[in-house]
Amino acid sequence: MDLSAAAALCLWLLSACRPRDGLEAAAVLRAAGAGPVRSPGGGGGGGRTLAQAAGAAAVPAAAVSRARAPRRAAGSGFRNGSVVPHHFMMSLYRSLAGRAPAGAVAVSSSGHGRADTITGFTDQATQDESAAETGQSFLFDVSSLNDADEVVGAELRVLRRGSPEPGPGSSTSPPLLLLSTCPGAARAPRLLYSRAAEPLVGQRWEVFDVADAMRRHRREPRPPRAFCLLLRAVTGPVRSPLALRRLGFGWPGGGGSAPEERALLVVSSRTQRKESLFREMRAQARALGAALAAQPPPDPGTGTGSPRAVTAGRRRRRTALAGTRTAQGSGGGAGRGHGRRGRSRCSRKPLHVDFKELGWDDWIIAPLDYEAYHCEGVCDFPLRSHLEPTNHAIIQTLLNSMAPDAAPASCCVPARLSPISILYIDAANNVVYKQYEDMVVEACGCR
């Protein structure tokens, strides 16, 4: 076994076998009566809505995911012990995955049409009163973006509330909003956007297209981890500075805003390679290993974090999965134990995937389950045309029918697959929407 294969095996074992308090979240939620979320593909499963899933924080975070706690920033929200997804990312998932209810407000689609990955970066900057007078800076850690991916769109979303009093200059012309890059030691700020701040009643998200600025940032020889933007307001003919809070920006009453009210940088990208869930699993395993190393060893006992409880949880999941496979294998006339004559012909069979049973519900937000299907049955002669056999499969099946010892029968395998969309929390605690190819079997064939 070469070193790369050995490393991959070790990472897989770490993901599957390390004691993980987060993996016990499924058992805790089952005890609390929480059900699975229906998949965007309409597969079987429970009837919870995504809004209910995002708000199902009845279980204390510390009891559900103590091992993941070091990865969470102070003051961040939790979803079953994880980061609370921004409302926009939830709306984006519903819209792009085809789950938006009738009459729902459409989300902006800057570059989303050509993207297969959309990442939401939450503002990490801290504001003070003096900074609010001159402008508001936004700081985003974009180091998790893959260098090989193409950025097809990026937008800054900032919450603005209506002001009860008209702003300065309202009788003549509205103030101007100026968005620029932050000044640095070796670079001058670059003006990105200039537009009028129209009077506002209620509240809304001001959206700024920053795709070109993001591309320039990534083209730098050694791009910094942080992507910094500065929003200012000016008024009058001489463009006098204006405090943003007078236009409804900023954090009411001082202090930090709620997670869902912080500014959001939404980056749409297109990967240059076929994405694999295994790659994200390895990243999750590395982050989890770092979190576990920072935790004190658990006390022996019967608690949810004890080795005995973790082992029991894994045993329950293995039993449940084995039971599911047995039930599926015995249905539909498969008849594995009655020889080849008793088996059904090659066809698509149900295969329900529950991410909670896999222990992935501590990082996958939606869907929590979906219908994947699988292919099962015999490929005997003559092969049916709907199985779309290859010429090689036809010859192999013919030889097998004449002399079974001369060649094995052709195999019943997926002939056509379709993607599903997954909303998840990556290893850097960003909420990511990604479309994964080849996740659902649409048709089976003999190969």
Curated annotation (Swiss-Prot):
GO terms for biological process: BMP signaling pathway. CDD domains: TGF_beta_GDF5_6_7. Residues 292-346 are annotated as: Disordered. Residues 1-19 form the signal peptide. Residues 20-318 form a propeptide. InterPro entries: Cystine-knot_cytokine, TGF-b_C, TGF-b_propeptide, TGF-beta-rel, TGFb_CS. Keywords: Cleavage on pair of basic residues, Cytokine, Disulfide bond, Glycoprotein, Growth factor, Secreted, Signal. Gene3D superfamilies: 2.60.120.970, Cystine-knot cytokines. The keyword Amino-acid biosynthesis does not apply. It holds the Pfam family TGF_beta. Glycans are attached at N80. Belongs to the TGF-beta family. May play an active role in the motor area of the primate neocortex. This is Growth/differentiation factor 7. It comes from Chlorocebus aethiops (Green monkey). The gene is GDF7.
